[in-house]
Amino acid sequence: MKFEEKCGDNGSIVGRNQSYPGEKHQPKGKPIANGEAEVYAKQEANGKCSTPRKSLSMYTWLEIQRHNHEADQLVINCKVYNVSSWADRHPGGHQVLNHCAGEDAMDVFRAMHPELDIVQLYLKPLLIGELAPGEPSQERHKNSQLVKDFQELWSIAEAMNMFHANLGFFFLHFVQILILEVLAWLIVYHFGSGWPVTMFISFLLTISQASSSFLQHDAGHLSIFRKSKWNHVVHKFVMCHLKGLSADRWNYWHFEQHVKPNIYPKDPDIDTDPLFLLGDSQPVKYGKKKIKYINYEEQHLYFYKVWLPLFMPVYLKLPSMQAMYLQRYWVCFSLQDITWVSSFYIYFITFGLYYGIFGTMLLIYLVKFLESPWIVYVTQMSHITMRMSTEENRDWLTTQVLATCNTESFFNDFTGHLNFQIEHHLFPTMPRHNYHKVAPLVRSLCAKHGLHYVNKPMLRAFGDIVRALKKSAALWADAYYE
């Protein structure tokens, strides 16, 4: 299936009326022919913004781009919003808004919010103006045809119901997790806590915990239920109760990575210095400044010794605890996280009858040590090996395709379907069981615009992580010893 086959001769969707943020609908789902919807349709046709209402100020892109600090101004659907006073209350964290300041955030906005009609209510008080007549609907340096084609692709995915989740799929994964958790306890109850039993239940709990990581990822991206509140409930239960980690901290951190993948210093996933130097520019920067906290020429060995075993029990656990107990913003949500996480430890104390408190804590961290390499390989194989740069303010499609790659998987559940990383980054709220359906359309669109759609074997992707670390180390050494 190709992208062009899903479009009509004029590039529009065949047999479907597009809807846009803020468009009203009649009871049967048909759009009301109001002025705002018609105006937006015309804007999309010519790629420029129409005459704004007289009550609103007019802005040029040059003026907006000056407000690119500390969540100042951003543009959504040709409208200009000042979010500086509201950023700290943003459910996705203030940093996401900081990263989009002074930019067209339309595609980001749509990608991260499944219930656009509700989010529009929060935007109304923040509206300060519109783009001036004649200004393009996105920054001038962006490819307007590419932006339009991706919007068409999004509408195609909606028309094919690719954003509708199969609840049975996620229910079976949830039941599998609970069965493994209960089975582990029953085995200890019947057979005691000897070493063979302990290692076997650790294996079961590792599968359960890894599956929980993937399920909380689904719920955190609001891709299970149509109503966000039910996704939040499932996310709290799985992330906090089953994994003992802060759901809110994960949201803030992970959404930054989605909005600005592989972009220094906005993507926290590549902010690993001084322990690891990633990409091409960061190692050279450290080398020229003669910075040597560790022997970076052996950082690929530290990947095996440090990153693989300590990612879950240390790298994720400590910042999660810090977010819950030390950070003052979003206090009410931190208290919710603390309550949920407390239930994780109470639940695990049921093993204390057989292992004691200290033995139970060792069991918890043994499982996290075993889970950690699994999650590291799955999450890092799609990003560390790809292009890293400072902010270049590219369009959504180009940003995501340059920073991510797909891997061939014989068993998608092993990776939580994250082997379709490109599709996941382009459509964060799409249920993962639909990634394979939209992948051919994405591949076709990338080919049309000359973007390299990377899809590699999984074992090669694993090896590329180490090869990327060695390459960065060599760049550091060249700059350090010159």
Curated annotation (Swiss-Prot):
Membrane topology: Multi-pass membrane protein
Pathway as given in its UniProt record: Lipid metabolism; polyunsaturated fatty acid biosynthesis
SMART domains, per database record: Cyt-b5
UniProt binding sites for heme: 90, 113
GO biological process: lipid metabolic process; unsaturated fatty acid biosynthetic process
Cytoplasmic side stretches: 1-167, 212-305, 365-482
Region of interest called Disordered, as start-end residue ranges on this chain: 1-31
Gene Ontology CC: endoplasmic reticulum membrane
Domain (Cytochrome b5 heme-binding): residue spans on this chain: 56-132
Compartments, record wording: Endoplasmic reticulum membrane
Entry remark concerning the domains of this protein: The histidine box domains may contain the active site and/or be involved in metal ion binding.
Family of this protein: Belongs to the fatty acid desaturase type 1 family.
Protein name: Putative fatty acid desaturase 2-like protein FADS2B
Annotated organism of origin: Homo sapiens (Human)
